[in-house]
Amino acid sequence: MKALILAAGKGERLQPLTDYKPKAMLPVCNKPLIDYQIEMLRKHGIDEVAVVIGHLEKALKEHLNVKFYRDASISGTASAVYAAKDFIDDEFILLYGDVFFDGSINELIKTPNSMAVVQVGDVSRYGEVIFRDGKLVTIKEKSGSGSGFVNAGIYHFDPTILDFIEKTEESNRGEFELTDSIMMLNRSEKVRVVPVNGYWNDIGYPWDYIDANMYMLNKIGFSAGENTEIWSNATIRKPVVIGSDCKIKNCVIEKSVVGDGCVIGEFSIVKRSIVMNKSKVPHLNYVADSVIAEGCNLGAGTKIANLRFDDANVKVTIKGKRIDSGRRKLGAFIGYNVKTGINVSIYPGVKIGSDSWIEAEVSVKKDVEKGSFVRN
């Protein structure tokens, strides 16, 4: 059997983390998300893998040795599958590129014309999959809150799905949705529904990305790469993953991921966070429940707040809408090549776009656009 991974999307809800990386290349404990997907597929005996690319495709093409198919329009999941129609000549497993799954898909592989579902505590974010006696009834785009089964973004199809993709009309969102194609297929021949067990994370929001890293941290425990220097008076509270060529000085690192070539300096504290490659947290910094992308440099005394003064849930602006993260503690999401001056304060839930500079003593209370220079 073969597999197709959809990795063409822009990952707009994950910005600024996807400013310069496709979401499938975002590192989870310093390894790209798509590597975990390919490893999971190969663990199930699936060696022939193709990837649909589009946005920031160069990174994927340089990293992977697989077949690539380009979705030039980037106009929905159905469009992405159709871009690889020449690859689809037999049964295949289809996997969304932003799904992190650590579990078994053996039953899905055994079940032709099927979709995987997972049980979650709140279906409202995902839409609910209704099925009876193992057969699909409907997929609710928006559902009420409460527990239920949701689309896991993993499928087992054959070339017949292409016939229904060709008939799929543009949705209200201006996209060609694979779920619409599946419902048409279901009216022709019943789609089977396969519940799967294991860790599942649809990495749609920046805090989902933190959660995926926290899951893998707990599995790994501790690791440090080659040529990394850890001072004897550094405090490392496991689980912690540190990359290669880092300098870990007199600091505290707790349940965090540090990429290659990073500096965590004197009297800095990094907790439940991801610091990507070649970033510096060098002096008297506080970083908690946050993500710092590659090539950043925090000025001395720069601190990221992770708790609202009123103890309410932290909200984040995603594509112009204020979204409740569902968590009391959440810091900031800092894009690539960001520099801050001394004593900068960054409020909870703030996003700072890539290539931005923040002047000394500034309090960053709202999102910063990419390429900005923020002054007092």
Residue ranges and their predicted role:
Residues 2-5, 13, 19, 26-27, ...:
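Conserved N-terminal catalytic core of the sugar/cofactor nucleotidyltransferase
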Residues 103-126:
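Conserved donor-nucleotide/metal-binding helix-loop-beta segment in metal-dependent transferases, i.e.
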Residues 234, 239-240, 246, 251, ...:
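Pentapeptide-repeat beta-helix register
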Residues 97-100:
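The conserved acidic donor/metal-binding loop of glycosyltransferases
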Residues 263-265:
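Surface-exposed extracellular loop regions of Gram-negative outer-membrane beta-barrel proteins
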Residues 93, 106, 135-211, 216:
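Catalytic-core segments of class I nucleotidyltransferases/pyrophosphorylases
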Residues 216-235:
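Long, charged amphipathic helices and adjacent flexible linkers at domain junctions
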Residues 272-376:
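Glycine-rich hexapeptide-repeat left-handed beta-helix
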